[in-house]
């Protein structure tokens, strides 16, 4: 049975799309890499086609290392501090992905100071029916 709701951790899927398709494989007419855009949209199309949800929400990280979490676990995502939060080639692709989702009517939600999984967790008590959560995160 298909889930009524499909909740996606958009930020983690965006990173997977970026690292899953080499930079330079797909470029916009101006030469800007769009590998993450292509990969994300391909994943989304496959998920919707396979799962056939009645509702879809894409949650985003508005803070990839929230202060409240670092206060509890000082080492939270410290490896990212050393290598940088987001690769330079991915940064301009993020707003393109969210804009495309908005343009096609997909709800994109984020909350200042929180990660996508926090947004997803806050939605669960408000949802009736079955839910499937899709994320690439392992934490």
Question: What label would you give each PLM region?
Answer:
Residues 2-134:
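Noncatalytic, basic helical substrate-engagement surface that gates or grips nucleic-acid strands
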């Amino acid at each position: 049975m298909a889930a009524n709701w499909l909740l996606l951790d958009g930020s983690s899927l965006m990173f997977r799309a970026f690292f899953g398709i080499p930079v330079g494989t797909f470029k916009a007419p101006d030469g800007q890499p769009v590998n993450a855009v292509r990969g994300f949209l391909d994943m989304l199309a496959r998920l919707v086609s396979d799962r056939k949800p009645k509702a879809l929400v894409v949650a985003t990280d508005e803070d990839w290392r929230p202060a409240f979490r670092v206060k509890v676990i000082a080492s939270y995502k410290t490896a990212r501090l050393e290598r940088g939060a987001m690769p330079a080639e991915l940064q301009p692709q993020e707003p393109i992905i969210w804009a495309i989702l908005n343009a096609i009517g997909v709800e994109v939600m984020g909350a200042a100071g929180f990660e996508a999984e926090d947004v997803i967790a806050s939605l669960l008590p408000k949802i009736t029916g079955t839910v499937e959560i899709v994320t690439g995160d392992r934490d």
